[in-house]
Amino acid sequence: MFCVQCEQTIRTPAGNGCSYAQGMCGKTAETSDLQDLLIAALQGLSAWAVKAREYGIINHDVDSFAPRAFFSTLTNVNFDSPRIVGYAREAIALREALKAQCLAVDANARVDNPMANLQLVSDDLGELQRQAAEFTPNKDKAAIGENILGLRLLCLYGLKGAAAYMEHAHVLGQYDNDIYAQYHKIMAWLGTWPADMNALLECSMEIGQMNFKVMSILDAGETGKYGHPTPTQVNVKATAGKCILISGHDLKDLYNLLEQTEGTGVNVYTHGEMLPAHGYPELRKFKHLVGNYGSGWQNQQVEFARFPGPIVMTSNCIIDPTVGAYDDRIWTRSIVGWPGVRHLDGDDFSAVITQAQQMAGFPYSEIPHLITVGFGRQTLLGAADTLIDLVSREKLRHIFLLGGCDGARGERHYFTDFATSVPDDCLILTLACGKYRFNKLEFGDIEGLPRLVDAGQCNDAYSAIILAVTLAEKLGCGVNDLPLSMVLSWFEQKAIVILLTLLSLGVKNIVTGPTAPGFLTPDLLAVLNEKFGLRSITTVEEDMKQLLSA
């Protein structure tokens, strides 16, 4: 096992990365190794998808499957080894079918890629794990060095984050052939074990630029189906009655669940990154969408144990449900998996609803505590002139984009302290689950404009980018000249690709934490600092002083 993709990876003087019987996320060495094997199979599939496009062959089954299966290897998504192997077998079957299509057009069709003809050696998981050793990401570290390995992983993990957003967009009916062609090209190239530093740096920027387009179509899918988010108050306390909790990012799953629970007497609560759903008109119209439950994903083993109903996980993040003994009432959807947990293959939630009706639910309603969400792209753009007016009248000094992933590390209290230290004449724009560090606190307003503005999920960084570009255009300056600073927390690969997106668009002087990614060497961090001004957090006092004086 070797995995260094998330923020909680093991860090020692001898090197970084989880390389024991189990990773810090709870992933076993077996599952981790089989995910490496799956990635190799997907790289071979992408190699043939690139070749097929040369012949004008576009296989939509391949295009929809490839990012989805890649998504299953993202942190805290799928811990079920047999399902990972199933994805690998499906990847190889699709590759062979695509290869046959190419050969039907050109009998001499060939692909020069080490993954292009990969076959699984056995049905036995142990044998497959031994085969996977051939594809361990750091297998040639001694030959290439840590810097090249780090750049490879930056690209691989960034592309994995983009693949997750591609799947979210695909579920909503969004497809862009150029994006998929670019994805396959990069994925196939990474399967050749590239070792050119400049090429890898260029690739990382290409991934960021591609992801900006992905976020654009995801935004179109969400707003096209469910309307543009508008500011909405959400109760974060319990309401009496039967209940279901839904977590993850998939708004379509939430919509289907709301439709199927309507009139059943079962209330629905969002959790984690599903909180922004309350801002969408077509979702909040369901009166039994009664609120949001819990805090950051890392607290789920305590909070889910206390929730008196079933739980549905639609995407990341899931962690061991046996710890809180709720594994008999947590359900997985789509690419999510945990051994022994029931999985929903389709859109039918009837079994979950039946379980909810059989459980006690909340016995009484708590005193409501309302927070505000729903500052989507349209709302943000509508406030652009107000923001400019406040700045011109010196009522608004600075905007801090304070968001990203949450996690268990104690140093993450920095982000709570930073938020509470932001001066009263400054505004906090937040997104993603890092907001749970401070989104239930009171921040007041500036002439009626809330000082805490929740823009949505992690992918809604797109809205923040569009707002920044709009403000810069209206003020006749560059984005980096705005009174705007980005202080971002990271945990997994979606955060990595958001960072690459911002860097590829030329955004500079981003501050990140709580730690630097374990796969980035001091040399690589120095390069990113020199090129983009990217740096790690220090203390709240020092960072606040520096950012306000910039």
UniProtKB/Swiss-Prot annotation:
The modification Cysteine persulfide is found at residue 405. This is Hydroxylamine reductase. Pfam families: Prismane. InterPro entries: HCP/CODH (IPR004137), Hydroxylam_reduct (IPR010048), Prismane-like_a/b-sand (IPR016099), Prismane-like_sf (IPR011254), Prismane_a-bundle (IPR016100). One of its GO terms (biological process) is response to hydrogen peroxide. Catalyzes the reduction of hydroxylamine to form NH(3) and H(2)O. Belongs to the HCP family. PANTHER family: HYDROXYLAMINE REDUCTASE (PTHR30109:SF0). The keyword Transcription regulation does not apply. One of its GO terms (cellular component) is cytoplasm. Hybrid [4Fe-2O-2S] cluster binds at residues 249, 273, 317, 405, 433, 458, 492, 494. It catalyses: A + NH4(+) + H2O = hydroxylamine + AH2 + H(+). Its cofactor is [2Fe-2S] cluster; hybrid [4Fe-2O-2S] cluster. Binds 1 [2Fe-2S] cluster. Binds 1 hybrid [4Fe-2O-2S] cluster. Coiled coil: none annotated. Its EC number is 1.7.99.1. The gene is hcp.
